[in-house]
């Protein structure tokens, strides 16, 4: 839908398939590729092409792709890529783990389904932390929509990163992890705590 509507509106839309030719199953959450890196490399290529306005490139992703979009809010990405995007949109992120926000040069929109099994609470916490840094962020909740609103709406079974609903994990700029309540946590403990089936 984004590709179709975007091109109708005159946008050039590049859809990245980070899973292309990778033997990764939806249950292999810890083996997923770094789609943010792919998107950022593509952005750098497009910026060199005179057909595109480098000041009007935005980044969006759905579900896992939305989690990849959330990587752009922290110091690790922003220190190396200032002013990378005009805006970012994360559609149905889990928000159970996110980088400690920094002041951004772009706006963010988060789209959530009201009935999603990736609950809204951690995204509200992320919004609060983003606002503390003076960022422009907005959350839109789609009534009666679940996580699969962009497809047929049929709920599947599998592993989800949704077990840190009220106390998400914050990735600090030094690479360490802590829970929202301030308690320290290891990567192994974080996976155990946040992954559910």
Locate predicted features.
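Alpha/beta-hydrolase active-site loop
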Residues: 28-50, 71
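Short glycine-enriched nucleophile-adjacent loop
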Residues: 66-79
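Alpha/beta-hydrolase fold nucleophile elbow
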Residues: 51-63
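C-terminal catalytic histidine-bearing segment of alpha/beta-hydrolase fold enzymes
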Residues: 136-197
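Short beta-strand/loop motif that positions the catalytic acidic residue
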Residues: 110-112, 142
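Conserved alpha/beta-hydrolase "acid-adjacent" motif
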Residues: 117-125
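A conserved short beta-strand
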Residues: 79-94
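Conserved alpha/beta-hydrolase
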Residues: 6-24
